[in-house]
Amino acid sequence: MGCTLSAEDKAAVERSKMIDRNLREDGEKAAREVKLLLLGAGESGKSTIVKQMKIIHEAGYSEEECKQYKAVVYSNTIQSIIAIIRAMGRLKIDFGDPTRADDARQLFVLAGAAEEGFMTADVAGVIKRLWKDSGVQACFNRSREYQLNDSAAYYLNDLDRIAQTSYIPTQQDVLRTRVKTTGIVETHFTFKDLHFKMFDVGGQRSERKKWIHCFEGVTAIIFCVALSDYDLVLAEDEEMNRMHESMKLFDSICNNKWFTDTSIILFLNKKDLFEEKIKRSPLTICYPEYAGSNTYEEAAAYIQCQFEDLNKRKDTKEIYTHFTCATDTKNVQFVFDAVTDVIIKNNLKDCGLF
């Protein structure tokens, strides 16, 4: 009896091959779809990472889009100098030049126009004189004792440029803007043949209840921590150290049953600010048991260990840690490249293709 297949058997074999092929194609397609969740406490740099994705993986911000950030730049600048002046009263710091008190009064009167996207020569002059004052600088140097935008010095030192009538914010100016994220911001881009959907979720406590429905089918979590927060308290709870809050949040995410099979990538962010701050503000403010030196390398490594030690599944779950500066495009590009390689490897493994 011969081994020739009947027409029916041949059709069944072809069908089987087609099903296998379709399954493989579906597997490869699934391996190319990446859902990234950006988590972390408020002001840890999540939204800046999203802006960097637009700069790196899309065409960046058009001139028209940059113009729309002008009002935000002015608002951030005004709010920064106002925060410093208000703190001077609380910290009992006097102006170096007593006549600056008149400028401060004038600033409060003129602030509204600049908040709406106009920076008159009068407002710019007032801010410039105040920023140069020795008392204002002394208060700025004590900014850990009150809430101040990270980009305060960036904008205030560049007032001549941003106060020009022809001013259009640069990509870097846009990266530095601070607007509290409310709700969920979704970004799509393609990189290394992967289709990314990135979700940026508000970090303040009031925003966290909105995270839960993003959890389904997440490929990886990027958890952002601001290294420079080690000596600060929360804007929404002045009793709580920001780093301790971040650790508490990371513990709940890292060991959550939802994320047993999810890659967790830890971005220890604002390394530039941390490197400056650690020279004058000891790590023992946050970790009283810390016995190392207040050098960037040693203090940063200690913080890394504090977070990685929270992982209760060390045998089966790896935390991929990177030190980042979210406002530095080259640094974010380099780190995201490494992150993508990890995602590709883990994705292929999950789809049985590795």
UniProtKB/Swiss-Prot annotation:
Q: Where is this region: G5 motif?
A: 324-329
Give positions of region: G4 motif. 265-272
Question: What subcellular compartments does it reside in?
Answer: Nucleus; Cytoplasm; Cell membrane; Cytoplasm, Cytoskeleton, Microtubule organizing center, Centrosome
- UniProt-annotated stretches for the region G3 motif: 196-205
A Gene Ontology term for the protein's cellular component: nucleus
Tell me its EC number(s), please.
Answer: 3.6.5.-
Domain of life assignment: Eukaryota
Q: Does the keyword 4Fe-4S apply?
A: no
Keywords from UniProt, A to Z, are: Cell cycle, Cell division, Cell membrane, Cytoplasm, Cytoskeleton, GTP-binding, Hydrolase, Lipoprotein, Magnesium, Membrane, Metal-binding, Mitosis, Myristate, Nucleotide-binding, Nucleus, Palmitate, Transducer, Transport
Positions with a binding annotation for GTP: 43-48, 150-151, 175-178, 200-204, 269-272, 326
Q: How does it assemble?
A: Heterotrimeric G proteins are composed of 3 units; alpha, beta and gamma. The alpha chain contains the guanine nucleotide binding site. Part of a spindle orientation complex. Identified in complex with the beta subunit GNB1 and the gamma subunit GNG1. Identified in complex with the beta subunit GNB1 and the gamma subunit GNG2. GTP binding causes dissociation of the heterotrimer, liberating the individual subunits so that they can interact with downstream effector proteins.
What protein name does the entry list?
Answer: Guanine nucleotide-binding protein G(i) subunit alpha-1
Instruction: Provide the species name.
Output: Gallus gallus (Chicken)
Supply the gene name. Answer: GNAI1
